[in-house]
């Protein structure tokens, strides 16, 4: 069967980061697991739901380790590979690091899909890994009923320059680098109400690597107190995790949140995923969204795939950071401020 004749999204029930296990379910499971005591060299582990682990090698070098994979979110195999790779690599950038190696994680239904499809998926991933300056060094594959692909990525970072989601400080400005809405837009593709050509802005955004470190001077990099990437738990979920880890409250100017052109159209037409509901269940007790209309309430819970970075920046540097990032991240915007901890983790204005 010729690969161009197969719409990959029609071969799976859920696509992209919308296929994540619901956060409340995942937390309940993990609470029942006895993990060993953390090694003294482990700078960042899973306690604060950060984007990657950090393991200190010496005073100059630490390892950044992460893993991400999912089912197809688009119909084109090569584009799927690019997006899956960009999404996995993003976790390294969210910690302030640089990716150095990547290993593929592949499940593939050999009985129903042509080998040419996986060649294209792997080529897309390989191209994106090379763009990030890393090396594609191998991986593992299994014959499975559903196509799944992603990467295990290792990066390097100076231990003194690590970003985490636990250091946002009162007074900081919040910068978001990419627009929101990939969950509802790709749900439109899966429902065959949209074609890829209708949402090219979102597809290009998902395939773009979050290499903010390449666009900021050392002084501006040092002005970033905390960071996280916005993915499957939506803007609301990842903002809440950053606020909780940092013991602060985020005030979000919701009207400043960048969104893709057709995002509200898709939300109005109920192109939704299960993750819209589970993300709302996860965050609603901990956020104040009373001032938002129905569409914005859906948008903040929209599960992002390969979404942007949310950066907590020294206020004096936020405009300079924004100006530098807009060279590559054109939708980037200042979307809120950080305040001392209040009753709710995130307040949407």
UniProtKB/Swiss-Prot annotation:
Zinc-finger is among the record's keywords: no
Protein's UniProt name: Selenide, water dikinase
Q: What biological processes does GO assign it? A: selenocysteine biosynthetic process
Listed HAMAP family? SelD (MF_00625)
Q: What is its EC number?
A: 2.7.9.3
| Cellular component, GO annotation | cytoplasm
> Where does this protein hold Mg(2+)?
51, 91, 229
* Organism expressing this protein natively: Nitrosomonas eutropha (strain DSM 101675 / C91 / Nm57)
Similarity comment text for this entry: Belongs to the selenophosphate synthase 1 family. Class I subfamily.
Q: Which gene encodes it?
A: selD
């Amino acid at each position: 069967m010729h690969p161009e004749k197969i719409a990959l999204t029609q071969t799976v029930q859920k696509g992209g980061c919308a296929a994540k296990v619901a956060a409340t379910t995942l937390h309940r499971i993990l609470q029942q697991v006895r993990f060993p005591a953390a090694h003294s060299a482990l700078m960042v582990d899973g306690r604060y739901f950060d984007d990657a682990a950090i393991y200190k090698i010496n005073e100059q070098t630490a390892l950044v380790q992460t893993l991400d994979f999912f089912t197809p979110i688009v119909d084109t195999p090569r584009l799927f590979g690019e997006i899956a790779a960009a999404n996995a690599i993003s976790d390294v950038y969210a910690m302030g690091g640089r990716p150095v190696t990547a290993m593929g994680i592949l499940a593939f239904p050999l009985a129903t899909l042509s080998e040419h499809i996986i060649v294209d998926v792997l080529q897309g991933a390989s191209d994106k890994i090379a763009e990030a300056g890393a090396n594609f060094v191998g991986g593992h594959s299994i014959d499975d009923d559903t196509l799944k692909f992603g990467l295990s990525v290792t990066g390097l970072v100076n231990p003194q320059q690590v970003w985490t989601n636990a250091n946002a400080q009162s007074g900081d400005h919040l910068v978001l680098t990419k627009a929101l809405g990939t969950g509802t837009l790709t749900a439109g593709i899966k429902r065959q109400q949209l074609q890829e050509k209708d949402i090219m802005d979102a597809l290009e955004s998902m395939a773009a690597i979050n290499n903010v470190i390449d666009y900021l001077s050392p002084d501006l990099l040092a002005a970033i107190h905390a960071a996280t990437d916005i993915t499957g738990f939506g803007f609301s979920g990842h903002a809440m995790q950053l606020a909780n880890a940092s013991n602060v409250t985020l005030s979000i100017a919701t009207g400043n949140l960048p969104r893709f052109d057709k995002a509200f159209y898709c939300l109005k037409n109920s192109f939704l995923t299960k993750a819209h509901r589970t993300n709302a269940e996860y965050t609603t007790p901990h956020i104040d969204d009373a001032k938002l209309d129905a569409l914005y309430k859906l948008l903040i819970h929209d599960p992002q795939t390969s979404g942007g970075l949310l950066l907590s920046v020294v206020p004096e540097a936020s405009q300079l950071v924004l100006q530098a990032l807009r060279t590559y991240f054109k939708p980037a915007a200042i979307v809120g401020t950080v305040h001392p901890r209040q009753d709710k983790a995130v307040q949407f204005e």
